[in-house]
Amino acid sequence: MTRTYVITGTASGIAAATSRILKEAGNKVIGIDVKNADIEADLSTKNGRQEAAKKAIELSHGSIDAVIACAGLAHPDPQTVSVNYFGVTEFLSALLPTLSQSPSPRVAITSSMASLMPNSPELVAAMLADDEEKALAIAQGLVSAGAGAEQLIYGSTKRALSRWIRRESIKPAWAGAGIPINAVGPGIVKTPMVAGMIATPEAVRDILQMVPMPLNGFMEPEAVASLLIWLSSPDNTHTTGQTIYIDGGSDVALRGENIWDLALA
């Protein structure tokens, strides 16, 4: 069965691999990125998100079966907030009426293993309150504070995104419309975004201390793409609200085997 997918971030990395695999299987893919995509748009702005959604609906002729949101930044600056969180949530909201008309609508999002890392609760709260202006001000404050505070920005965007997915997944707009909405939480993936982080043996050693991956080490984008494709396929009928960590064991290595007691603490 041929399906129509809208995928953000298709110029490189996980989204590029996902797009290629889906196209090879005969599906239609509408790719979005700042350049080198079917739709060139800046998801860091409200106008860019709305324009991208409008063009996606036009190119799909009003028929969208799944959205896979992979576009993201890892820079320790406020723009990362706009792209990683609002560039997902507002974009999805704009596509929801069209997506809901599919017989098997699905949403899959790229979060990160960083959602489990230290974050700024204040920044996370501002994003979850859909207050972009406040969130940007908080992020700028972290940059201005220095001493590494700006490094909390990326993890905060992914924590907020995974929490938004849990919050929204069971609401009538999503569950009531038959739309599973989930995320993947990758560990270290061999993409242009992280190339500089694993460029030397010393860098590899340092990052594995922070993000241990005892099962098979760093992964290729195709490994994550396969999970995104299943989550956004008709085969996924009941999995929703989840961030599934595809991380070579990082989550377990860092949090241990008993996360249930931690959840109740």
Where are these regions (language model features)?
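Short, flexible catalytic-loop segment of classical short-chain dehydrogenase/reductase
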Residues: G185-G196, R205
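Rossmann-fold cofactor-recognition segment
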Residues: V34-R49
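Hydrophobic structural elements of the Rossmann-like NAD(P)H-binding subdomain
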Residues: I68, A108-T110, I181-V184, V194, ...
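Short C-terminal tail/terminal secondary-structure segment
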Residues: E122, T240-A265
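C-terminal helical subdomain
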Residues: E90, E150, Y154-G155, R159-S162, ...
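Canonical Rossmann dinucleotide-binding motif of NAD(H)/NADP(H)-dependent dehydrogenases/reductases
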Residues: M1-I30
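Catalytic loop of short-chain dehydrogenase/reductase
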Residues: G72-L73, D77, S100-A177, I188-V189
